[in-house]
Amino acid sequence: MALLSILRYPDPRLHKTAKPVAVVDDRIRQLVRDMADTMYDAPGVGLAATQVDVHERVVVIDVSEEGNDLRVLINPEITWKSDERQTYEEGCLSVPGIYDEVERAARIRCKALDQQGQPYEFEADGLLAVCVQHEIDHLDGKVFVEYLSNLKQNRIKTKLKKAEREAERA
């Protein structure tokens, strides 16, 4: 089990756009295992490779309460979004301790590759739809707090810098 270091907002590397995975090989499968271990250890319900400073289009998600329904999305692409919207309070492993409401599509359809490189499609609603959209945003260089007002973004940056200074003193 290898735990990866998670980048913290506002690290500029979180704004890099991830490149598509050309070949799903053992290196990618190891990345998936390490990302899953990191996500479960954090604990979180989703993690994009961008968050661990790997700029390839790889996402792991598990929104189950038991933590036993790992979904691997390689080169994920949302192919349809409902016009209906939903608002969820989101958090992020790259923005620790910060939660705020974000409005997103209520239902989506997504296509991706699994860890064997096989294509698949699925539809999602509720927390899974939110999580897929959130993690794909990471791959596109966007962090959830960027949906918030400038005032809220500045408050979050101040709060995170203060927490970082306190952690350094400890």
UniProtKB/Swiss-Prot annotation:
EC class of the enzyme, as a word: hydrolase
Molecular function, one GO term: peptide deformylase activity
Record-level GO BP terms: co-translational protein modification; translation
Record EC number: 3.5.1.88
Record-annotated active site: E135
Catalytic activity: N-terminal N-formyl-L-methionyl-[peptide] + H2O = N-terminal L-methionyl-[peptide] + formate
Pfam families in the cross-refs: Pep_deformylase
PANTHER family, per database record: PEPTIDE DEFORMYLASE
The protein, known as: Peptide deformylase 2
Gene name, Swiss-Prot/TrEMBL: def2
